[in-house]
Amino acid sequence: MPRWILGDKFDTVFPHKGSLKVLWESRWKSACSKSVYPFHDGSIEDFEPIFNHLISKNINDAASDEYTQAFLPTASALEEKAAQALQAGKHEEASNLLCRAAVVYRISRFPYVDITKPSSIKRVAFERQKQAYLKATSLWTQPIREVTVPHTYRTGNDGAHIPIYIRTPAGADQSNPVPIVLIMTGLDGYRSDNSQRTHEILARGWAAVVAEIPGTADCPADPADPASPDRLWDSVLSYLDQRPELNTAKMVVWGLSAGGYYAIRAAHTHRDRLLGAIAHGPGCHYYLDPEWLAKVNDHEYPFEITAAWATKHGYKTVEEFVAGAQKKFSLVETGIVDQPSCRLLLLNGVDDGVVPIEDCLVLFEHGSPKEGRFYKGLPHMGYPNSLPVSYEWLEQVLASPSKTKN
């Protein structure tokens, strides 16, 4: 009997590994044509020529400068078209073009913006992505606003400021404060990659707040300190308390992929502040098992992932990460999940080869009772089946009585 629920797939090397041609033709082209992960807001007419170029030049390493550079002219051309549309008063067209430019930048800096390389070309692409995206969303009826939150609870190697996005529905004000969904982003998806989620959240009359997780993008929390996210959320929640149009007594968090780890942690450490938490495709313990880490680069994630994970957790080498991360960061090993928690919904595909489904199942053996929905035959995140369940659960939880603030 195999040790891992993933079964034979645990030892399988997926055919797209090391081949951008196979990745594009077998996985990404279809996702791009549907504008789904990781191509949200994108258009295949922008991407097909780029991937044809990369394939013709045999560029297969997404970590290379050549990979990123291949996307930049297309993104710049879209920004120029957007400027012309804006000058002509065509605001909706300009916004759509800028969103398309932003997602081209997003794929160019995929899969990870190395926080230890502030001058890298991927960082440049990320900065351009944010600029294009905020221009695009400023043209929406209900725009997304960037706010720089003071990290009032910071210690040690934490940075001083926390950039977040906030989007509120029409009618939100001091006399009508609205519930909050705080999105915790992932390893490769950052603040500017969540348009559709904010649309869905606002359509239900809630505010969307989007924040990045330690070791990624612009997050100032010390990636090497397992307790840094606790201070991060303390500062974010303290700021949100000061916004009169936001009802912080009716708040849930939604952690996506790597963000799911932080949703699980917050469900325990900040249980008195939250009505609930969704951990969507989360790791908590087994994803850091050396046996799992020895095989994860072979699985469904588009590129190698362990180097990014190592940097994200504050390690200088993959070897140090593999040797020490589970003992240091596991929410089981450190006893976090033995504490009481707020309501916690766990969602994933049973065939997840990025973080094992065991990381959801083990939580039912610890702490407060949990809720879960797992999808046989589906990979990481359990898409598309898991999304309707997410919104149904949020609707139920945010209709519950408010939390009493301390």
From Swiss-Prot:
List the coiled-coil residues.
Answer: none
What phenotype has been reported when the gene encoding this protein is knocked out? Leads to a yellow-green color of conidia. Impairs the accumulation of 1,3,6,8-tetrahydroxynaphthalene (1,3,6,8-THN). Results in an altered conidial surface with masked surface rodlet layer, leaky cell wall allowing the deposition of proteins on the cell surface and exposing the otherwise-masked cell wall polysaccharides at the surface. Decreases the protection against the host's immune defenses. Causes enhanced insect mortality compared to the parent strain in a wax moth Galleria mellonella infection model, probably through exacerbated immune response of the wax moth.
- Classification via SUPFAM superfamilies: alpha/beta-Hydrolases
Regulation of protein activity? Serine protease inhibitors strongly inhibit activity. Moreover, 3,4-dichloroisocoumarinshows and 2-acetyl-1,3,6,8-tetrahydroxynaphthalene act also as a strong inhibitor.
GO CC annotation terms, alphabetical: endosome
Tell me which Gene Ontology terms the entry assigns under biological process: melanin biosynthetic process; pigment biosynthetic process; polyketide catabolic process
Which pathway, metabolic or otherwise, does it act in?
Pigment biosynthesis; melanin biosynthesis
Per the record, what is the consequence of mutating residue 257 to A? Answer: Results in a complete loss of enzyme activity
**Per UniProt, which keywords does this protein have?**
Endosome, Hydrolase
Q: What is this protein called?
A: Heptaketide hydrolyase ayg1
Q: Which organism is it from?
A: Aspergillus fumigatus (strain ATCC MYA-4609 / CBS 101355 / FGSC A1100 / Af293) (Neosartorya fumigata)
The upper taxonomy is: Eukaryota, Fungi, Dikarya, Ascomycota, Pezizomycotina
